[in-house]
């Protein structure tokens, strides 16, 4: 189970009612909080997720190279405080709508990269914990389109 909200971001192995194990969690700020803070810095009203999606469609996702804290560390833990700080610094330099669109697109791309990698690690851990012989992670299906769909539906 991947839980993402304004207050929590966690990977859980749910074995049954009341039986779960946390595989990873945010060590600082939740992803939903990062979305809301980014939206506020871009002048978007709450809730920010759907509006960031709209702005991101008009932007260049490669314009800003945003940090991915603990991205290359093993495990399923997440960190978004450094990303929020980078957005704060860049937002102070924005002068045009296009720069705003580009920052929204870069922010969304960075989040997708983080969640894709950490979700893949979580699936691997799930396979180990449940002694699965077959691969559960659907390599080709669980791609960018699915993550984009998750963002649209649940943020």
Language model segments and positions:
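Short glycine-aspartate micro-motif
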Residues: 1-3
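Short beta-strand scaffold segments in enzyme catalytic cores
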Residues: 9-13
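Short amphipathic alpha-helical segments
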Residues: 16, 128, 151-152
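N-terminal low-complexity segments that are often proline-rich with Ser/Thr-Pro
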Residues: 142-154
């Amino acid at each position: 189970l991947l839980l993402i909200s304004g207050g929590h971001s966690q990977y859980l192995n749910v074995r049954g009612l009341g039986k779960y194990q946390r595989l990873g969690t945010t060590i600082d700020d939740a992803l939903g909080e990062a979305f809301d803070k980014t939206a506020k810095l871009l002048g978007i009203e709450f809730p920010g997720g759907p509006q960031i999606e709209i702005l991101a469609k008009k932007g260049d996702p490669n314009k800003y190279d945003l940090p991915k804290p603990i991205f290359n560390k093993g495990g399923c833990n997440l960190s978004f405080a450094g990303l929020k700080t980078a957005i704060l610094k860049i937002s102070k330099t924005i002068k045009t709508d296009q720069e705003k669109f580009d920052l929204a697109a870069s922010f969304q791309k960075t989040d997708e990269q983080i969640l894709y990698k950490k979700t893949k690690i979580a699936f691997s851990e799930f396979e180990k914990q449940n002694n699965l012989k077959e691969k559960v992670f659907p390599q080709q299906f669980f791609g960018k389109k699915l993550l984009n769909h998750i963002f649209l539906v649940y943020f």
